[in-house]
Amino acid sequence: MTNSKTVRLRVMQGDTIAFGPGKAALLQAIDRTGSISGAAREMEMSYRRAWLLVEEMNRCFNQPLVETATGGASITALARDVVACYQRMQKKADSAIEKDMLHLQSLIVGKD
């Protein structure tokens, strides 16, 4: 859907968002830039916020999604699988709710 009103999936672990669109974007940015700081700059967020999100993701999954080393960071094979799975889930959800979303959007004040 190209409309600005949309539904975004979030995978919860208790009260914690284990994974969602922001964390997917952060992993992709780390993959592109090779570092958490580079990803944070690209996403216009603080390094501290990016680091906390990485720590949270690494705690929520049975294996780390991001590995750090002197001079940078990289995403793991598990992270690539998680991002791909999340994107498939989001695409299926968008498709499943498309008709109802269009109807709901027609009722929302200030629609685009």
Question: Which role fits each region the language model picked out?
Answer:
Residues 30-38:
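Short helix-boundary/capping micro-motifs
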Residues 41:
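Alpha-helical residues within the helix-turn-helix
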Residues 59-74:
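A short LG(V/I)-centered, amphipathic sequence patch enriched
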Residues 86-104:
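Alpha-helical linker/hinge and terminal dimerization helices associated
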